């Protein structure tokens, strides 16, 4: 996979690009809450190339050590560059925090005509640091939104805890549930502690083109199905131009990736062994999780093909 590197200083965004030999008209941007030079982003890019489209990975520079007041203009600049190189169709895809990035960008950049949000929530996230302070993997960026636009921070849902209680909540809930990590209670507390006002909700009704929202009922990181349901209702009650596809599964937890991408990440037998150690909810449901990933894969592939031909 040939990769071209981009920097904020030179290009207006931090990213990697891998063109497809099969299609120089459509490109999909992978959004990730870490530096794009990661195994999972590069695997997603390889998977997109094999799906017949060019792929770009975008994320914050390493020095940011997280996503806090991250300018969504990074995505806008990448879209402009792709279109200047002949890519008439530009899409975005994100999972977990990356889905918040994808949705928040797509509602502000009309040139994005395919948005794939895996395990999304419907409100703008608080800013986060991944700087390993005091041995924590994540902590809230106090007083900071995850994103900014035109120099202004987006209104956001405040974190219910500060450091170090925030990360301790992750570990404690994971221990109670038998998972490596869990934060369902933390996110529920965030909603209970702050009104879900319209300004912090992502205005998904402004998204153009194709939109896929996918999640699982056994997700213990946050209640993605609740967020998906609210977004679906918002879209159906508006004069939205998007072609919405909602995919909700009984089993697949927070790691809801297309099956063909999972096989690039890990050998098939390994994912069945590893998942129960990450999320106890998958114990006894390996076949059901795989069936969900296969179904998701088929829907995404068919949507990409339809989008490319449209």
Show where each model-derived region lies.
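Accessory cap/linker subdomain of secreted extracellular hydrolases
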Residues: 116-203
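Catalytic nucleophile-loop/oxyanion-hole region of alpha/beta-hydrolase
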Residues: 58-91
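Short amphipathic alpha-helix adjacent to the substrate-entry channel of hydrolases
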Residues: 39-57
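Gly/Ala-rich beta-loop-alpha elbow adjacent to hydrolase catalytic centers
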Residues: 94-98, 102
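Conserved alpha/beta-hydrolase "acid-adjacent" motif
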Residues: 220-230, 257
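Catalytic active-site module of serine/aspartate enzymes centered on a nucleophile-bearing elbow/loop
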Residues: 260-310
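N-terminal cap/lid segment of alpha/beta-hydrolase-fold proteins
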Residues: 1-26, 292
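Short beta-strand/loop motif that positions the catalytic acidic residue
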Residues: 207, 213-215
């Amino acid at each position: 996979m040939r990769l071209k590197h981009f920097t904020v200083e030179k290009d207006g965004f931090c990213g990697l690009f891998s063109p497809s030999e099969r299609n120089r008209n459509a490109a999909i941007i992978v959004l990730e809450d870490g530096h794009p030079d990661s195994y999972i982003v590069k695997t997603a890019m390889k998977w997109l190339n094999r799906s017949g489209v060019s792929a770009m990975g975008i994320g914050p520079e390493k020095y940011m050590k997280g996503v806090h007041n991250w300018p969504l203009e990074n995505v806008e600049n990448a879209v402009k560059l792709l279109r200047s190189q002949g890519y008439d169709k530009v899409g975005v895809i994100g999972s977990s925090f990356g889905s918040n990035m994808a949705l928040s960008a797509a509602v502000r950049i009309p040139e994005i005509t395919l948005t794939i949000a895996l395990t999304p929530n419907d409100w703008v996230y608080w800013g986060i640091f991944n700087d390993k302070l005091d041995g924590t993997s994540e902590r809230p960026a106090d007083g900071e939104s995850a994103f900014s636009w035109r120099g202004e921070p987006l209104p956001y849902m405040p974190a219910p805890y500060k450091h170090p209680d925030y990360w301790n909540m992750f570990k404690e809930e994971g221990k109670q549930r038998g998972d490596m990590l869990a934060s369902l209670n933390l996110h529920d507390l965030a909603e209970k502690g702050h009104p879900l006002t319209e300004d912090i909700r992502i205005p998904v009704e402004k998204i153009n083109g194709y939109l896929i929202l996918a999640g699982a009922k056994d997700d213990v990181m946050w209640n993605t199905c609740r967020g998906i349901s609210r977004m679906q209702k918002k879209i159906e009650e508006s004069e939205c131009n998007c072609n919405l596809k909602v995919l909700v599964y009984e089993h697949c937890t927070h790691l809801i990736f297309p099956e063909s991408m999972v096989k690039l990440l890990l050998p098939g037998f390994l994912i069945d062994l590893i998942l129960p150690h990450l999320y106890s909810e998958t114990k006894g449901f390996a076949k059901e999780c795989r069936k969900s990933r296969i179904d998701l894969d088929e829907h995404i592939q068919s949507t990409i093909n339809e989008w490319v031909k449209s």
